[in-house]
């Protein structure tokens, strides 16, 4: 596979340019904006909500970054989007909202989180959203089955 030149053209801010002491929480819109302001590409993580939307959040549980407990996939996108991230005014963004903020200004590396159970709903939702996006975007996953499915579902995506 050919690696797009834009992928390595600038530093990549892992989960955005976050700094908890400054209220810039990982995978938040504020951390994404900070990365954009510093001309960094952004790496983010996505997970599936209970109602099938792609949410930008790293952990499988809410405990570390919100005042809620439980699994991310047990709440709807609307519920998750209303949860404030600890130490900031930000809430958990949908992938759609995250892409609207980035608006192609910097490249995005989007990690599709997996429980290694063969569930392709998040992958399918992410690809559907990405097809509407005009900016530089690449998906990654540590789940080989998801990567193989991505090659089948969207062979032209980097």
Residue ranges of each PLM-predicted region?
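Phosphate-group recognition and catalysis centered on beta-loop-alpha active-site segments
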Residues: 1-158
């Amino acid at each position: 596979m050919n690696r797009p030149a834009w992928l390595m053209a600038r530093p990549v801010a892992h989960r955005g340019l976050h700094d908890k002491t400054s209220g810039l929480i990982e995978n938040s819109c504020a951390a994404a904006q900070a990365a954009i302001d510093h001309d960094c590409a952004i790496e983010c993580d996505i997970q599936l909500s209970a109602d099938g939307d792609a949410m930008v959040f790293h952990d499988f549980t809410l405990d570390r970054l919100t005042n809620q407990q439980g699994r991310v996939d047990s709440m709807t996108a609307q519920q998750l989007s209303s949860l404030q991230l600890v130490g900031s005014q930000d809430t958990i963004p949908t992938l759609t909202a995250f892409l609207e903020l980035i608006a192609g200004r910097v490249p995005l590396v989007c990690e599709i989180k997996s429980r290694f159970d063969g569930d392709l709903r998040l992958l399918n939702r992410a690809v559907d959203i990405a097809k509407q996006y005009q900016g530089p975007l690449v998906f990654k996953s540590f789940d080989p089955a998801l990567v193989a499915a991505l090659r089948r579902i969207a062979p032209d995506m980097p």
